Regions:
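C-terminal domain-boundary segment and adjacent tail
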Residues: 5-27, 54, 59-63, 67-69, ...
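Metal-dependent polysaccharide deacetylase catalytic core of the NodB/CE4 family, i.e.
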Residues: 31-33, 53-150, 154-173, 196-205, ...
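Short active-site segment of divalent metal-dependent hydrolases/proteases
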Residues: 41-42, 95
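Aromatic/hydrophobic pocket-lining residues that form the small-molecule binding cavity
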Residues: 45, 75, 107, 111, ...
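Histidine-anchored nucleotide/phosphate-binding helix
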Residues: 45-52
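Alpha-helical elements of Rossmann-like donor-binding domains used by nucleotide-donor carbohydrate transfer enzymes
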Residues: 47, 113, 139, 143, ...
Length: 262
């Protein structure tokens, strides 16, 4: 359970109380951690799913709908089983196409196809798009916003309100090139606990670097840290108190001035 800490030091916890990362400085900043596994390879079902169940933890899988049932991929039935158990689903296009190859029109066609498959499979509530290879283009982001609440990049960082909803940062666990270690990922958790914010961790269960024992260790570390382990969409619903207007990106002196509606 998560309490809000108000200026007078009291806490409140009701069903209608929003859990806010920041509330004009009045509430204690809260650290939230969510996990997303990309690609829906067979290992997401055979290796990751049993761990998710054993640890009783929330997880999201990013699904390339057109590749399900192909060699090395999960089957539709496996995805449905995971969804029934509480695992949530993100879009990873139909066939893992890189957005750099897209126009707004081709992307729209792909996302319509993806939506149709999800409906056909009875999978609801797909509210995010994990960009293939982490790539995205400014001229396609309005199309993303039309279909999804979140666009997930591979840029490292902790997400702070107001969220750049089409450019959500993620930190990879077990990178293929072993460029950093589990201790480095723990340091990101520490930073989230210290500063508040939403840390989205990315895994690829099919990478040879994926380590089940280390994932267990990391989940234990997160739980002991005081950070809240939350499903991607639960975290968004709990903290998404700011509605974006226009296309928001922090860097760039010549960018249009962003504004937000609270």
């Amino acid at each position: 359970d998560m309490d809000l800490y108000w200026a007078d030091g009291t806490t409140t916890q009701t069903e209608t109380t929003p859990v806010m990362l920041t509330n004009a400085g009045r509430s204690k900043k809260k650290a939230i951690v969510s996990f997303v596994d990309d690609d829906c390879r067979s290992e997401a079902y055979t290796v990751l799913f049993p761990l998710v169940q054993e640890l009783g933890m929330p997880y999201t899988v990013a699904c390339p709908a057109g590749l399900m049932g192909k060699t090395g991929r999960m089957t539709v039935e496996q995805l449905q089983e995971m969804a029934r158990s509480g695992v949530t689903v993100a879009c990873h296009t139909m066939t893992e196409t890189d957005m750099e190859q897209d126009t707004p029109e081709t992307l729209e066609a792909t996302l319509q196809q993806f939506e149709a498959e999800m409906r056909r499979w009875g999978i609801r509530g797909v509210r995010s798009y994990a960009y293939v290879n982490g790539r995205y283009k400014a001229d396609c982001l309005n199309t993303v916003k039309k279909y999804f609440d979140l666009g997930l990049t591979v840029e490292k960082g902790i997400n702070q309100i107001p969220y750049e909803s089409c450019r959500m940062k993620r930190v990879e666990v077990f990178p293929k090139n072993k460029s950093y270690t589990l201790e480095d990922v723990k340091a990101w958790v520490d930073k989230a606990v210290q500063d508040g914010g939403w840390l989205i961790l990315m895994t690829h269960a099919w990478y040879t670097t994926f380590d089940a024992a280390q994932l267990k260790e990391l989940v234990g570390y997160i739980r002991a840290s005081g950070a809240e382990l939350m499903d991607l969409y639960d975290a968004l619903d709990a903290t998404g108190n700011v509605v974006e207007a226009g296309d928001y990106q922090k860097p760039g002196a010549d960018a249009a001035e962003p504004f937000f509606v609270v």
